[in-house]
């Protein structure tokens, strides 16, 4: 397939199907081609030349619409500064293609699959187009198993599925990126397969921090790049919407190759899937589409579906995907997060209220869900403990109004006990992170699932009623809580 693809590109460039720019509106441009030589939808167009200042221009665009009168409308993958009407546009005859395989490991790429880490060219002998169809139903794998993360609140209340799709939902500044970094730290380091990280429309500083951290932890091996276990694909906030709209597909294409050809288990991290939707909405109006609910593009569900349906596990290998989802104005009913919900196996919802209390990770134990939390999957002990924790926290939530008006003293003895245990549970759900050591000064903790279950069982059974609630705050397992209590008294 790859050879035919490469020869196809070579033959089309040889015959050179050339058009001219007729209109430029921001990141969207129109080009006219000779009759009978119209490029196909999703074909890559290349514009080369010089701008008025004499600087070289090399811009790749993707065809989005055929307008009639031999005109096409395309979205640019980089800034359109310096383009003029009448400039030549060359049709490559094929969709955007990016390098895949072992040569991508340890490197940083942009949306076009070009390395941007100043470490020289990448062997692009094997390339794949970024637009591909999802695997057939007959190819899909339906095995159910838990993916342990070492984070108590996640493993106990909303466990992740191996080969599943997980969403981290939260508004601005509640800790989505820190949580995704911790998951990379806990899972990618211990994970035998490869990881692909797609930075979609997020801060460049965070992308740089992640790269430096991966080099320090040897996930990216500087001495021997080929031994690295991760490929990074960035299309950050400063990029035009065309790049942010397609960079997720570039990362996914690299992950699919490891799954389908190398038959590996792959981790795919995307930060942030909302920016993919946002970029689509930015170009949607310029492409002449009528906006739909809240100003989003009318094709929102289709675009999301075409990306998410490709992120799946087949009989060849699995892709476990962890995606951060920004929630505009903390409104989970906004069309962007609401559309994402439908595709996920587990949702980890971050709460501003918990972040304000200083409970990190600020995961809302009552809002977060997982299809894996079934007694026949996780076992009755895990299931019963999780349900007990949720019931205790739910009762505490119901009692909060009474406490606010009348005070704790007006509660029955039984309710006071529930409140005391719920506050301990709430604090024990917090945990020091490895990636946050620099902020907190506390060393990070990885807590196994067995230790997590044991700790919460002891709190719910009342075995630790004599300990102060501060002892449970920002500790790992239950033994650390009892040790901390001894230092407090």
Curated annotation (Swiss-Prot):
GO-annotated biological processes: proton motive force-driven mitochondrial ATP synthesis
Database matches in InterPro entries: AAA+_ATPase, ATP-synt_VA_C, ATP_synth_F1_bsu, ATPase_a/bsu_AS, ATPase_alpha/beta_chains, ATPase_F1/V1/A1_a/bsu_N, ATPase_F1/V1/A1_a/bsu_N_sf, ATPase_F1/V1/A1_a/bsu_nucl-bd
Major place of residence: plastid
Keyword ATP-binding: yes
Entry's EC annotation: 7.1.2.2
Description of how the protein assembles with itself and partners: F-type ATPases have 2 components, CF(1) - the catalytic core - and CF(0) - the membrane proton channel. CF(1) has five subunits: alpha(3), beta(3), gamma(1), delta(1), epsilon(1). CF(0) has four main subunits: a(1), b(1), b'(1) and c(9-12).
Annotated protein name in UniProt: ATP synthase subunit beta, chloroplastic
The species this protein was found in: Zygnema circumcarinatum
């Amino acid at each position: 397939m790859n050879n035919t693809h490469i020869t196809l590109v070579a033959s089309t460039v040889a015959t050179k199907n050339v058009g001219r720019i007729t209109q430029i509106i921001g990141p969207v441009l129109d080009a006219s081609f000779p009759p009978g030589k119209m490029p196909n939808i999703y074909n890559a167009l290349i514009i080369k030349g010089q701008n008025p200042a004499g600087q070289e221009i090399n811009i790749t665009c993707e065809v989005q619409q055929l307008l009639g009168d031999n005109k096409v409308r395309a979205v640019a993958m980089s800034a359109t500064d310096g383009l003029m009407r009448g400039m030549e546009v060359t049709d490559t005859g094929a969709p955007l293609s990016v390098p895949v395989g072992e040569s991508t490991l340890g490197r940083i790429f942009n949306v076009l699959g070009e390395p941007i880490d100043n470490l020289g060219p990448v062997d692009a002998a094997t390339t794949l187009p970024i637009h591909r169809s999802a695997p057939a139903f007959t190819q899909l794998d339906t095995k159910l198993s838990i993916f342990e993360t070492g984070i108590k609140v996640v493993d106990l209340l909303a466990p992740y599925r191996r080969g599943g799709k997980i969403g981290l939902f939260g508004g601005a500044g509640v800790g989505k990126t820190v949580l995704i970094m911790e998951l990379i730290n806990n899972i990618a380091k211990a994970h035998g397969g490869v990881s692909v990280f797609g930075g979609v429309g997020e801060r460049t500083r965070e992308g740089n921090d992640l790269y430096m951290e991966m080099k320090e932890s040897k996930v990216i091996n500087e001495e021997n790049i080929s031994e690295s276990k991760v490929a990074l694909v960035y299309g950050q906030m400063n990029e035009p919407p065309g790049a942010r709209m397609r960079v997720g597909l570039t990362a996914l294409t690299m992950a699919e190759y490891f799954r389908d050809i190398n038959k590996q288990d792959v981790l795919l991290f995307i930060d942030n899937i909302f920016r993919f939707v946002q970029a689509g909405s930015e170009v949607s109006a310029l492409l002449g589409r009528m906006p739909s609910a809240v100003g989003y593009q009318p094709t929102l569900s289709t675009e999301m579906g075409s990306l998410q349906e490709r992120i799946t596990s087949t009989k060849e290998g699995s892709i476990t995907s962890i995606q951060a989802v920004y929630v505009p104005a903390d409104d989970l009913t906004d069309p962007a997060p609401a559309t994402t919900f439908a595709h996920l196996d587990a949702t980890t919802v971050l709460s501003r209220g918990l972040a304000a209390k200083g409970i990190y990770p600020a995961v809302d134990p009552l809002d977060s869900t997982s299809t894996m939390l079934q007694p026949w999957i996780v076992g009755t002990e895990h299931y019963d403990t999780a349900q007990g924790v949720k019931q205790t926290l739910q009762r505490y939530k119901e009692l909060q109004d009474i406490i606010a008006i009348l005070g704790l003293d007006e509660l029955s003895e039984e309710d006071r006990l529930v409140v005391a245990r719920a506050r301990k549970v709430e604090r024990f759900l917090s945990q020091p992170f490895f990636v946050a050591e620099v902020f907190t000064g506390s060393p990070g903790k990885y807590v196994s699932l067995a230790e997590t279950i044991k700790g919460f069982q002891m709190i719910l059974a009342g075995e630790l009623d004599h300990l102060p609630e501060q002892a449970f705050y920002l500790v790992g397992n239950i033994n650390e809580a009892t040790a901390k209590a001894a230092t407090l008294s």
